Amino acid sequence: KKRIDESYMLHGPYIKRIDDQTIEEGFFYFGLKHGRWVRLNRSDILQDKETYFMGWLNESIRFFWDPKKENLKEIIPIKYGEKNGMYYAFHLNGNLAAKGEYQFNNKIGVWIEYHSKNGKKKREIKYNKDPYNKNKTYISREWNLNGKLIYDRDLFLKKINK
């Protein structure tokens, strides 16, 4: 990760323009999208309108570990009434527990689980890239608590297919 000293956090109204044409408009709250955001094409025709709350789509479902709603448990991205977007789950200590992507209510791509104590990878689970492809889901890799690789499906398949 590279730190850029000359960068600033976006805070306040934001308008993205190409020449005098507004392409995107919204509001940043300490670097997070907040409130209503609109995207327009070059003919000023509305392409997309979304509402955010502190960086998350407003429809998204947020669960917390405590009644005061201070410790986030998971965020389920909801767009147009369906699970769409990046999913995040957190351990009680605040470390990331899992992340992956939903598309049309289906898990897609690689989902990663993390150990609670040190935040290192625990498991990679591969789902189909296409939500309508019904091939089987499988664990592609697994690590122990120290971060040592204990299972790699590709290496395993190479060994048994020799």
Describe these PLM feature segments.
Residues K1-K162:
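Glycine/tyrosine- and acidic-biased, solvent-exposed loop/turn segments at the edges of beta-strands
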